[in-house]
Amino acid sequence: MVVLNDKDVRQKTGVILEQKSNLMGEETGMDKKWTLHVENFAKIKSADVTIAPLICFVGDNNSGKSYLMSILWGILTLGKDIFPKKPSEAKAYKQCESWLKKHLNTETALTVDAIDLYITWFNELLSTQKKALVKKIFNYEVEIEKLKITHYERNHPIKIVWDASASRYSVTSGYIKFPEVEAANREELLRMNAYICWNLLMEGIAAPWYTPVVKGRRNGEPIYLPASRTGFMLTYAQLIENSLQISFSPELQDNTSTLTLPYVDFLQLITKFEINKKDSKK
């Protein structure tokens, strides 16, 4: 549920998460839920967003709906980028590393306490990188004091399993599987810990950890649906795929586009639909 201090219905913004579920998150639906908490973010003093397969923000114009939806979209889409490239000496990560070392090659249930280690690590990464993440999402600096995941819950338990015949990592709603290892070094432990952390939060919600890019998108990426302001919808056709990609090229130190990244992603998506539609008429 998303609660904003808005009484008047004016504009609506939403995001679709990939889920094989109903909208209630029951037995056939989401196997996990968590809340994104922000404080002193742009014009928003405090807000909590609990994930669901379809999230709609409804309220007054300029009440902060797009800010909240954009930050949620950004964590789901760009969250993998905040994990360190080298083993960290931070206390939160070292606790995850120690836990995993104790359970190498042993089928182990992820208890509430174990899961909390990984949520704490992810929150520390969010805290230290929140300004850079927000700038990447919005294409300009936005004030943010707190950004973290709270109220993590699961409908079903999950465990770590090891397979001597496996050659790759894999995940389902019930287990995270790794190939058996003789003696994992710190780099291998980091890769496994990042995989565990990401999937505890994002399995079935965002794109999997290892997902190829097909036609510019990763399977499972959330879709941001901006408010349907007429002027915006009339201009999208003028924005072509190449110009958007150039504007947000990772090689450019300062992005030249004035659009936020969720809007660019949405425009690229509907541009592809437009191209496919034209091709089908030929």
Where do the language-model regions lie?
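P-loop NTPase switch/coupling surface
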Residues: 1-259
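Aromatic- and Gly/Pro-rich amphipathic surface segment
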Residues: 253-271
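ABC-family P-loop ATPase nucleotide-binding domains
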Residues: 268, 273-282
